[in-house]
Design a protein with these regions (language model features):
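C-terminal structured domains
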Residues: 264-353
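Long, hydrophobic alpha/beta structural blocks
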Residues: 1-301, 305
Length: 353
């Protein structure tokens, strides 16, 4: 659950060369405003495609953020500084994009909820979890404005009008944002390449935050499954089985700690084949995957809880990833002619979907 304490929206109009910086925060008592901001922040906070980073010692923004967190700078003033920086940088891009800038200070109470789940039998731990404030986060989001059309009926007038200031829907993905944990300094961000004077730049991590860039949860899980599939094919194992086991290991690790260690996943899958495990670890190192990557339970469920396969005959099967580790439910066997037989067993009921 998110609790937004402050939020503000600034407008950039690159066509006219005009910027409109708000002088007051958004009214979060207004139901629609609060709903939009919360849903937008929830979308980016839980995005598995967010890359992770840490501030460089020379980061200018890190110092300013620390001053704000300590109360030395007011929220509106700090948001103006951020907006001015983005205004100057974005207008230098070869292809300018109309956008608004959302800045927010909010609390993510999911950490407290996780503590409650992990200590369900410990009354003191539960009390601590509910009393805790969760993670205090600071978000900077570029909201692309899109052209839309509205129907206007006014007396004898009946027109279709163009609206150039339409914000993206709360559930729509946005390409450019940063979320910083004000307690730990940990950064989640997403950005796309922009051409500035003919040179490609990721302005959020490289120029604004000045931070490192580690693979996202989605990227790490994808790399792990690719490595497992390649090794399964190389050593004559069934790729569908081994990849589903890898996904099950990811889901299980996220359920317990909300962190996935690629090396531990390999040890879990190839514990009886040390020669494959050694190759797996070498490939993890060569691809420079992080030792650990944060993966929330909900994200793991979406990405790894189920595994889907499709045969060359057009049959598609989706099944729980952990089913291949449970004998007597789903079996893959190779025939002498190279064909594969898939057996689904112990089924008591079939439902059309």
């Amino acid at each position: 659950m998110l609790r937004v304490t402050k939020a503000i929206l600034h407008v950039f109009d690159f066509e006219t060369g005009t910027k409109y910086f708000s002088q007051s925060t958004l009214d979060l008592e207004d139901r629609q405003t609060k709903s939009y901001v919360q849903r937008r922040l929830r979308k980016i906070t839980a995005n598995p495609e967010s890359r992770h980073g840490e501030f460089a010692p020379t980061s200018n923004f890190a110092g300013g953020l620390q001053e704000y967190a300590h109360g030395d700078v007011e929220f509106v003033e700090f948001s103006h500084q951020i907006a001015q920086w983005f205004w100057e940088e974005l207008r230098r891009a070869d292809d300018v994009e109309q956008c608004d800038l959302l800045v927010a200070d909010y609390i993510d109470t999911d950490a407290g909820q996780a503590l409650v789940s992990a200590a369900a039998d410990d009354e003191d731990a539960q009390a601590e979890a509910f009393e805790g404030e969760g993670r205090r986060l600071f978000a900077i989001v570029l909201l692309p404005r899109k052209q839309a059309f509205i129907h206007d009926v006014n007396g004898s007038a009946n027109e279709i009008l163009r609206q150039d200031a339409t914000l993206p829907s709360p559930t729509q993905k946005v390409d450019s944002y940063a979320v910083i944990d004000l307690d730990t300094g940990a950064i989640d961000f997403h950005d796309h390449d922009r051409s500035v004077a003919g040179e490609g730049k990721f302005i959020i991590p490289e120029l604004f935050l000045e931070c490192s860039s580690e693979a996202s949860s989605h990227e790490v899980i994808g790399e792990v499954t690719v490595i497992v599939q390649d090794l399964a094919e190389e050593y004559g194992l069934e790729p569908a089985v081994e990849v589903s086991r890898a996904k099950a290991a990811v889901a299980e690790a996220a359920e317990v700690e909300e962190v996935v260690d690629p090396i531990k996943v390999g040890k879990r899958i190839f514990e009886e084949r040390p020669e494959i495990q050694e190759k797996y670890e070498a490939q993890v190192a060569s691809r420079e995957l992080p030792e650990e990557v944060p993966v929330k339970r909900g994200v793991a469920n979406r990405i790894a809880k189920n595994h889907k396969i499709r045969t060359d005959t057009g049959i598609e099967i989706s099944f729980p990833s952990n089913l291949t580790d449970r004998p007597g439910y789903l079996e893959f066997s190779h025939e002498s002619d190279g064909r594969i037989t898939i057996s689904i067993k112990n089924v008591a009921h079939i439902e059309n979907r």
